[in-house]
Amino acid sequence: MRACLKCKYLTNDEICPICHSPTSENWIGLLIVINPEKSEIAKKAGIDIKGKYALSVKE
């Protein structure tokens, strides 16, 4: 599993399908967003698409 360096979206791809930025295998923490419209944590993190996200990503 890889995390986007920009939006932190988790994917298996080397390029993020959401923002088209590079991804990294060096990430920690997991945030699963089911309903971004109602999630206070998603709003604070700037997430508006449901999915799995890393809490921290390094190159």
Curated annotation (Swiss-Prot):
GO term, biological process aspect, one: regulation of DNA-templated transcription
Gene Ontology terms for molecular function: zinc ion binding
Keywords per UniProt: Metal-binding, Transcription, Transcription regulation, Zinc
Pfam families: Spt4 (PF06093)
InterPro entries: RPABC4/Spt4 (IPR029040), Spt4/RpoE2_Znf (IPR022800), Spt4_arch (IPR007178), Spt4_dom_sf (IPR038589)
Binding-site residues, Zn(2+): 4, 7, 16, 19
Domain of life: Archaea
PANTHER family linked: TRANSCRIPTION ELONGATION FACTOR SPT4
Function as written in the Swiss-Prot or TrEMBL entry: Stimulates transcription elongation.
Family in the record: Belongs to the archaeal Spt4 family.
Subunit-structure text: Heterodimer composed of Spt4 and Spt5.
Name this polypeptide is given: Transcription elongation factor Spt4
